[in-house]
């Protein structure tokens, strides 16, 4: 019996050792001009490094969006506060040394690199512009750090994401209330869609790019939805759009180009992400200082967790679908934080404090 107990104990220890992983995440601190590299070992979140970013020592340049290249060799950072234009920065992972930068539009924000084209697509949010100023998506060669095109979309575009196959790019425009589809290969705007659960106007669901700018400029009435984020399902058949202004997330069938489900959320939903196994949608509630977890099969919210401070921001989920990493800005001089949620038991398991106004996150790697 004693030998059997020891054998079972050895097996348990061995299995737990094999399953232990280190998860590495980059997170911006917008009011600190820093990027934090965080390592989560399954129990504790460690701030491995605080990386100063930008080139102006006495000015806050505002690191906002961040993404890691598909090969994991570089990370890219949008610096929102330009004079007047912002920049895209390129850094080497590991050493975290700056490689290059390129000037873009007004307040560059969210970005992602296409698996199909290898190009980087980044929205120019134009936070301080007028509510009728049409902005753009910049398309950048991340190897040469050259902007090769700009595609006009709507007013205050945000939430730049691509299908997993890299062939289609999606973004939303906060003050236009619309979703935009760009062909990643041809760099052309193909379709637009109102993010309102009930389609009210003919032009809301029409899919032509030729008159898009004129149509948006003529519609001075701001839609109440104020969409802030879009994220594709791993099957590349569905999209999830966060309507910050009307407290809901809409599920969109890409082929039908229509809304098929609406999830009523807590106050001020802001970002979202779908786990790679397709089971869960994690939504940050900026206005409620909470994070929600939705079961996509049932359409029900299965967990809602209070965050450690106010102003919940972004979320990224580990590739093994085990953990959600949530950034929480904090208020004033309060440090920002990255919180770790276990998607097996829906509990918060770790918190790492970083610089002020924690914002964009990007997953780097997992190591055994």
Where are these regions (language model features)?
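Sec-dependent N-terminal signal peptides
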Residues: 4-13
């Amino acid at each position: 019996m004693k030998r059997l107990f020891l054998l079972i104990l050895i097996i348990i220890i061995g299995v737990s050792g094999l399953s232990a992983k280190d998860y590495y995440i980059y997170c911006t601190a917008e009011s600190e001009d820093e990027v934090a590299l965080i390592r989560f070992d399954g129990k504790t979140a460690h701030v491995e490094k605080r990386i100063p970013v930008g080139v102006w020592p006495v000015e806050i340049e505002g690191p906002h969006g961040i993404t890691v290249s598909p090969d994991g060799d570089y990370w890219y950072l949008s610096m929102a506060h330009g004079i007047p234009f912002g920049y895209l920065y390129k850094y080497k992972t590991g050493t975290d040394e700056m490689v290059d930068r390129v000037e873009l539009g007004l307040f560059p924000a969210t970005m992602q690199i296409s698996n199909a084209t290898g190009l980087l697509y980044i929205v120019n949010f134009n936070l301080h512009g007028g509510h009728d100023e049409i902005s753009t998506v910049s398309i950048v060669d991340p190897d040469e750090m050259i902007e090769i095109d700009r595609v006009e979309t709507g007013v205050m575009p945000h939430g730049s994401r691509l299908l997993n196959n890299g062939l289609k790019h999606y973004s939303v425009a906060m003050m236009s209330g619309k979703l935009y589809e760009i062909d990643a290969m041809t760099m052309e705007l193909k379709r637009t869609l109102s993010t309102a659960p009930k389609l009210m106007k003919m032009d809301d669901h029409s899919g032509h790019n030729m008159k898009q700018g004129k149509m948006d400029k003529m519609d001075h009435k701001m839609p109440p939805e104020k969409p802030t984020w879009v994220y594709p399902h791993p099957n590349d058949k569905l999209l999830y759009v966060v309507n910050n202004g009307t407290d809901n997330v809409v599920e969109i069938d890409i082929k039908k180009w229509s809304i098929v489900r609406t999830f009523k959320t807590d106050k001020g939903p802001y970002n979202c992400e779908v786990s790679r196994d397709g089971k869960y949608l994690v939504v940050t509630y900026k206005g409620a200082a909470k994070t929600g977890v939705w079961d996509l099969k049932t359409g029900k919210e299965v967990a809602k967790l209070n965050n450690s401070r106010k102003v919940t921001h972004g979320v990224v989920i580990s590739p093994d679908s085990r953990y959600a990493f949530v950034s929480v800005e904090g208020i004033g001089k309060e440090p920002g934080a990255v919180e770790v949620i276990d998607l097996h038991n829906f509990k918060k398991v770790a918190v790492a404090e970083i610089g002020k106004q924690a914002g964009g996150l990007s997953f780097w790697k997992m190591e055994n």
